[in-house]
Amino acid sequence: MMTLLAILAVSYIIGSIPTSIMAGKMLKRIDIRQFGSGNAGGTNAFRVLGWKTGLSVTLIDIAKGVIAAVSVVAFFRMHPIGAYPDINEVALRLLAGMAAVIGHVFTVFAGFKGGKGVSTAAGMLIGIAPVSMLIVIGIFLLTVWLSRYVSVASILAAIAFPLIIAIRKYVFELGGGLDYYIRLFGESFSFHDSLDYHLMIFGLIVALAILYTHRANIRRLISGTENRITFGKSA
């Protein structure tokens, strides 16, 4: 139990790093939450700080999820403290990743007012199911490019994830997942692309959560007042 609590605590702290808020204060000496949509996430960083900074913020927020789901769990596997909980590996990584997402949304470093958690959740799932997430990222990027609405892309990507897991697992009968091997710089690396049923359940919950956190965006989309991003502005 102590190990599980340590994993969740470290993951929460990693997720709490307020990337967009730090970028706003360092680059323009502003609180990004007072501009644009008022959200402390990558999407608002694109609007307020420009696409280069927005992209950097988004990538760092994604990395927070990857680190929580992969590195933190792996570290405590090698250096356990107390009794290790008897829990499914994928479920454990999901718990660690969710702790990071909660940290991003309710950051302890910025008055518990952070972003919406989309990028950090994506990072967590990249660490657990990278192939499925590559498909989801493709859907996200294509939707952003065609519509210029990051909110629409986020919603569609969230809905697509559990569907992709289900199709790969049951239609293509890939079971619990696949192991992949790559060779870089003369070294061989392996990674597991999970199709565990926990992912489908989690994916459905995330899709509902994304719809809930984007309810204001949905209202603006219906009224035609939702902000579009541009790719010509830089900071």
From Swiss-Prot:
What processes in GO biological process is this protein linked to? Answer: phospholipid biosynthetic process
Q: How does it sit in the membrane?
A: Multi-pass membrane protein
Q: Where in the cell is it found?
A: Cell inner membrane
Q: Which pathway does it operate in?
A: Lipid metabolism; phospholipid metabolism
Which intervals of the chain form a coiled coil?
none
Q: What class of enzyme is it?
A: transferase
Write down the SMART domains for this protein, in alphabetical order. G3P_acyltransf
Q: Name one GO cellular component term.
A: plasma membrane
Q: Which family does it belong to?
A: Belongs to the PlsY family.
The annotated subunit structure for this chain is: Probably interacts with PlsX.
List the HAMAP family: PlsY
The name on file for this protein is Glycerol-3-phosphate acyltransferase
- Originating organism: Chlorobium luteolum (strain DSM 273 / BCRC 81028 / 2530) (Pelodictyon luteolum)
- Lineage of origin: Bacteria, Pseudomonadati, Chlorobiota, Chlorobiia, Chlorobiales
Gene behind this chain? plsY
